[in-house]
């Protein structure tokens, strides 16, 4: 009997180790996969990297569709059109230790340019930006902006946001003016607040166009409704 119990315990240990390894490999593959996608690629390419989405939505009348993925360290949002071409994707961090690279953006550190990552303030990414929207409800605060990349980013928009479904890299700061905020209010907010979300638009895209049809980053209530939050 003692031998049998020991054998069961050993098998359980092996299974736990295998589960940990498989989860680690899956997570590592997902994180590495972020550097393998961009707008303009096929949605099938995205599925080949990340697998089937945990949630999908379709706005058939507008010709755009959304896949949502949830991994240990981040949410991934992918928007594509009727031609199966990705027109937008965003990453929202779920872990303050997870600081993914931001496409097209570099910082000058120690006499050299290095890839920018999440974990810095809005102002550190760009001295100026274009305000999109911000809101404050009884449940959450959010904020979103974009910068136009021009030639270095192949004429795309790069989006940043504080998404309430994501992690707080720094103490939450509330924008004092949320409807048509003044430049003074924006500057004060951007100096101390940190985005937890970045998004990449399509070539020659419009911030009022298909690329933001589903918003920027996973919807707060959609995130709360995922199976991972049930138990």
PLM region descriptions:
Residues 1-20:
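Hydrophobic, helix-forming membrane-interacting segments
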Residues 12, 20-23, 68, 202, ...:
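Intrinsically disordered, low-complexity N-terminal regions enriched in serine/proline/glycine
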Residues 91-231:
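Non-cytosolic coordination micro-motifs
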Residues 19-110:
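Short N-terminal edge-element motif at the start of the domain
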């Amino acid at each position: 009997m003692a031998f049998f119990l020991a054998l069961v315990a050993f098998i359980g240990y092996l299974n736990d180790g295998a589960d940990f390894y498989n989860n680690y490999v899956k997570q590592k593959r997902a994180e590495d996969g972020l550097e393998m996608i961009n707008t303009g690629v096929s949605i099938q390419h995205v599925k080949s990297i990340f697998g089937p989405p945990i949630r999908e939505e379709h706005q058939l009348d507008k010709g755009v569709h959304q896949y949502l993925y949830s991994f240990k360290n981040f949410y991934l949002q992918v928007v594509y059109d009727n031609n199966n071409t990705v027109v937008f994707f965003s990453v929202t961090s779920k872990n303050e230790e997870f600081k993914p690279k931001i496409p097209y953006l570099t910082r000058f550190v120690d006499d050299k340019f290095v890839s920018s990552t999440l974990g810095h303030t809005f102002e550190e990414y760009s001295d100026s930006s274009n305000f999109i929207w911000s809101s404050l409800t009884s449940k959450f605060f959010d904020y979103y902006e974009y910068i136009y990349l021009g030639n270095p980013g192949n004429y795309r928009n790069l989006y940043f946001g504080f998404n309430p479904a994501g992690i707080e890299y720094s103490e939450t700061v509330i924008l004092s003016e949320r409807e048509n905020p003044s430049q003074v209010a924006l500057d004060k907010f951007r100096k101390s607040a940190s985005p937890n979300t970045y998004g990449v638009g399509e070539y020659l895209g419009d911030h009022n166009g298909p690329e933001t049809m589903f918003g920027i980053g996973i919807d707060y209530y959609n995130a709360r409704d995922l199976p991972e939050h049930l138990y």
